[in-house]
Amino acid sequence: MKRLVSFGLSVLMAAALAACGSQQSNGSSQGQGAGASQELKLKVSITVSEKDTWGVAVKKWMEDVEQKSNGRIKMKMYANESLSNGNQPKGLEAVQNGSTDISLHSTIIYNVLDPKFAAPSLPWLIPSYEQADKAMNGEAGQKLMELVRSKGIEPLAFGESGYRQITNSKRPILTPEDLNGLKIRTPSMEAMVATYKEFGGDPTVMNFSEVFTSLQQGVIDGQENPLPIILNSKLYEVQKYLTVWNYMYDPIVFGVNKKLYDSLDADTQKLLRETAQEAAKYQIELNRKENEEVLAQLKEKGMEVVELTPEQIKAFQEKVQPVIDKYEGIIGKNLLDAFRK
C-alpha cells in the first residue's frame, strides 16, 4: 500500500512539474492572468499588402516586441485580410471574438460596429494633417478610443491611412456633375455611400480584395483610397484618372482583443502599448513622406492627375452638406466638435 501511495504521489508531482514547465500560450486562446514569463504568439491582421506603410510599420512593431521581450512574445503578420478571406468587417469581428489577436483596421471599417466611427472621416471635416494630429492626439482621439474599447477591442495606438483620393476609368473629375452615373466602389460606411449619392454617383459597397478585378472587368468605374494604397495595389493598371481632393481623413486603429489584453500582466500591456505607439508614429511619418513621392510615381505610371483648388472643392462641400447635417444628429455634435477643434 505504501508503495502505491508513494507511486501515486510521484505521478502527481511529475504532472505538476510538467504543467509548471509549460508556459507557452497562443494569444488566441486568451489564457487568463498571463505572467511575465509566459510566451505569447500573436496573430496580426492588416487589410493591405506588406509593402504598404501599414505592413512596414507592423514589421517594425513585431521586431521591437520580440527584441524587448527577449523573444518571449512573437507576432506574425497576415496581410491582405487573408485571415478573413478578404472580408474586412469579418476581419474586425475576428478581433472582437478573439480568433484574431490584433488588427490594423481603418475607423471606416469600424463603422460596421457603430455609425459614430464615421466621425473623423466625414467629408472635409478634418481639412489638414495639422488638425488631424490635434484631434487624434487630443480629446477627439480619447473619445474614439473609448468607443473602440466599448466594442471589445483595446486600442493601443492610432496610425493613419491618410487622405482618400478618387480614381476612375471614364473621365477627369473636377465638379460634382462629373460623378454623375459613375459606379464608385466604397467600403461599408453608410456616410460614404450617402456622400456619393449626393454627388450623383452610383456607390457600390465591395470588399477591397475584389476591387482590382472588378475595375478590370468593368463591374465598377472607380474607387477611392489613399495614394500609397492606389500605388501598392497597382490600381493605376486599371484606372486612368486620379483626382486629389483630400475629402476624407482615414485613421487606423492598432487594436487588440480586449479579453486577451486584460489577461496580460501590466508589464506586457505596457510593452505592447508603447511599441505600438512607436510603430504608429513611424507609420504616420512614412505615410506622409510617401504621399508626394507616390503622386509623382502615379503620374509616371500614366495616370492623368487633377489636383482640385479650394474653389473647386467648395462646390463638392456645398453638395454634400446634407450628409454632414444628417450625421451630426447620428454621431452627436459633441464628438464632431472635438474633431473640428
Task: Locate each region found by the language model.
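Positively charged n-region of N-terminal signal peptides that target proteins for export
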Residues: 1-4, 8
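Enrichment for repetitive, rod-forming helical segments
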Residues: 9-10, 276
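C-terminal motif of bacterial Sec signal peptides marking the signal peptidase cleavage site
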Residues: 16-19
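N-terminal secretory/targeting leader peptides
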Residues: 21-129, 149-341
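A gly/proline- and charged-residue-enriched helix-loop-helix capping module
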Residues: 127, 131-145
